[in-house]
Regions:
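Hydrophobic alpha/beta core scaffold segments
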Residues: 1-343
Length: 343
């Protein structure tokens, strides 16, 4: 193994195809985010993968179709097992969470699993002792080279476009996992109230302050900028919904399904700057196992150029923190616990 790989075992980072393949052949336990051609070129081994081409690295944001972002779990996890989840079996992912550990779930973007996870899990949230994290795969939406979203079970060498795959990871007795969410957005308190009658990823008709409107027309009329999410409160949590540009003629595609009866407003425009994210991130934990970032925040973060970034990770079509999140940073943290906390 090359010297630079030895020094970075157990860490996240951007690697070439050959470096990633070498880690797989060495038996490392990996989560891989990469271009579809890169993923399908990797050998079988103990890894899961999802399509992604935008990443936050130590000194900025990059798009790469040649390199893979690798999260190495080998030195963190005591044992692991694979789970496969088509839409009709998705709720069983909660039943499969380890008693002490975490689960890392990858979902193909715009699949029925994506819609179902975003819509139903927000409503049926269950208390668990171990966290569920991960991301929704997808890349380059709205561009000429947009990719077909899929996830990969690298253990068996199988590609899935309509099912989620998960690694259920068990920790040692003296360790505990938790997740934290960095959300730079809040509701614009003075904004219009927007509601939708059904759960959907493609948004057409809505009600604005009780009046029926075409949502795409409303977004254009109010010159809503790319990167400004809808924000709503769901069971006490603030959830963002990323809107994809360019808009359709009479529809808008979202990266998380809207929920019926939830009152949405657009986030405050002054929260779109990178400094707002930095201010919120300062309060977050620095020692993390993995970080996932919202795809809709990439333009905002990339504009800031080469500045130190505390949380390397992929920009995904959705971040998982028990529920489906948009335009946040989700951190997976594993900590040692005191002896009196160990049962």
């Amino acid at each position: 193994m090359p010297q630079n790989l030895r020094s970075q075992q157990g860490h996240s980072g951007l690697y070439t195809l050959e470096e990633t393949a070498e880690m797989i052949r060495a038996g490392r336990l990996l989560i891989v985010a990469a271009d579809g051609d890169v993923l399908t070129s990797l050998p079988e081994g103990t890894w899961l993968g999802g399509v992604c081409t935008r990443f936050q690295v130590g000194n900025g944001c990059v798009r790469s179709a040649e390199k893979a972002f690798v999260i190495d779990l080998t030195d963190v996890v005591q044992s692991h097992r694979l789970g496969l989840y088509p839409d009709f079996a998705l709720e069983s992912v909660y039943e499969d969470l380890p008693s002490n550990g975490f689960s890392f779930l990858l979902i193909p973007g715009f699949s029925e699993v994506h819609r179902y996870f975003g819509a139903q899990f927000a409503i049926r949230r269950k208390p668990t002792s171990s966290p569920l994290t991960g991301f929704v795969a997808g890349a380059d939406v709205g561009e000429a080279y947009m990719q077909d979203p899929f996830v990969v079970d690298g253990i068996h060498g199988v590609v899935y476009r309509d099912s989620g795959v998960a690694l259920h990871c068990k920790l040692g007795k003296s360790q505990r996992a938790r997740i934290e969410v960095i959300n730079p957005f809040s509701e614009g308190a003075a904004g219009d109230v927007i509601t939708f009658e059904s759960s959907a990823l493609v948004l057409r008709e809505c009600k604005v302050n009780g009046e029926t409107r075409n949502f795409a027309d409303y977004v254009r009329e109010h010159a809503v900028p790319e990167g400004l999410p809808l924000v709503g409160r769901v069971r006490g949590m603030t959830l963002n919904v990323t809107l994809l540009f360019p808009l359709g003629r009479r529809s808008v595609t979202a990266l998380s399904p809207v929920l019926p009866s939830v009152e949405y407003r657009f986030a405050r425009r002054d929260e779109m700057g990178c400094q707002r994210y930095v201010d919120v991130a300062r309060r977050a934990t620095r020692r993390v196992v993995a970080s996932m970032h919202g795809y809709g925040n990439y333009p905002m973060m990339a504009k800031e150029g080469n500045k130190e970034r505390p949380f390397p990770g992929p920009f995904a079509f959705g971040e998982i923190a028990m529920l489906l999140m948009n335009q946040t940073t989700v951190n997976l943290i594993v900590e040692e616990v005191d002896d009196d906390e160990v049962q």
